[in-house]
Amino acid sequence: MRAPGCGRLVLPLLLLAAAALAEGDAKGLKEGETPGNFMEDEQWLSSISQYSGKIKHWNRFRDEVEDDYIKSWEDNQQGDEALDTTKDPCQKVKCSRHKVCIAQGYQRAMCISRKKLEHRIKQPTVKLHGNKDSICKPCHMAQLASVCGSDGHTYSSVCKLEQQACLSSKQLAVRCEGPCPCPTEQAATSTADGKPETCTGQDLADLGDRLRDWFQLLHENSKQNGSASSVAGPASGLDKSLGASCKDSIGWMFSKLDTSADLFLDQTELAAINLDKYEVCIRPFFNSCDTYKDGRVSTAEWCFCFWREKPPCLAELERIQIQEAAKKKPGIFIPSCDEDGYYRKMQCDQSSGDCWCVDQLGLELTGTRTHGSPDCDDIVGFSGDFGSGVGWEDEEEKETEEAGEEAEEEEGEAGEADDGGYIW
């Protein structure tokens, strides 16, 4: 007689236990979320699960579309179960609260944010599981040729860029082929015998300009996505130590890279800008930023590295190219620069045939202008400080001579005092 009663009691208890477990899972998911962590910015930082066994570092600049949100249907199969094309891959994929599952064919599933699905283009080839009716065109992994988008992010193909534009409802275009940042007219990186060429001052200056433009694109894109406010902690400390000239995309990028929030960038943090394959001068550039040679870059060193003035001769050449190129006036003097962007010792005007000697800053040495080639090595060689016209003196000898002269003067004054007397 008790068996039916027990059955009626067990069923409600089981339902209550199942409800408690479901509530616990929901709380665990909520606690596991990372609220406002700027290192989880979907636009250009990948998640911690993207460590590579080969690369041995966290590639924060990985293609945003090719991230861990894409799951393989084959990985979810158990044992030797045969592939069933009638099954839905989204059946075994659990997305977070704010995402919905999209089936791409019968082997792949993708969890997409609901916000990104608000303005999608409807595609009948891809099925959406949720209350959204539109979807963006999928991309095939075989068609890979990286491009740099107008938002400053690198995409594995043009299709990926178009897909991201569709997902985010943004107008994106290809800035250049290959990864970001887009190169300008790059000088040759190797000599005729195949040996690598050292990075000159002009190479480092050009690289700094490209990186600064790239950082600005990333910063603007972050503002549009509303993720700039999530870095208020590190940025507030940064603002206290940086000058006004560095409170822009340069300072913002520093706070992004400074994961330890100690206002220093060590080699591990700098390695997040993984461009060694495409920018041969990237490591020499960051090494040049470390003016104290302590193995890390401070906030002041970082700002100075990007806002330092270009060498004078190189800056003059660029000014001539910008201002004088359109006028096309004949007889314009073009200075001769060395490999580091400073003036060569001898400068010549091709139109008049006159030559003269200058210092590194381009200041003409008096009396050196002549019709021909002056011997600037002998003229400038007299000066220890190049181009100053003043020879160095031995400070110790100079101090010894001055001390001797002072001693003689004191002896002379004492003698004059002893010889003094009265005439009666």
Curated annotation (Swiss-Prot):
Residue span, Thyroglobulin type-1 domain: 310-376
Q: In which tissues is it expressed?
A: Highly expressed in brain. Also found in lung and testis.
Q: Where are the transmembrane segments?
A: none
Subcellular localization:
Secreted, Extracellular space, Extracellular matrix
- Superkingdom of the source? Eukaryota
Q: Which Pfam families match?
A: Kazal_2, SPARC_Ca_bdg, Thyroglobulin_1
The record's Gene Ontology cellular component field reads: extracellular matrix; extracellular space
What does UniProt give as the signal peptide span?
1-22
Which segments carry the region annotation Disordered?
387-424
Concerning SUPFAM superfamilies, the annotation shows: EF-hand (SSF47473), Kazal-type serine protease inhibitors (SSF100895), Thyroglobulin type-1 domain (SSF57610)
Q: Name one GO biological process term.
A: synapse assembly
Protein name according to UniProt: Testican-2
Q: Which organism is it from?
A: Homo sapiens (Human)
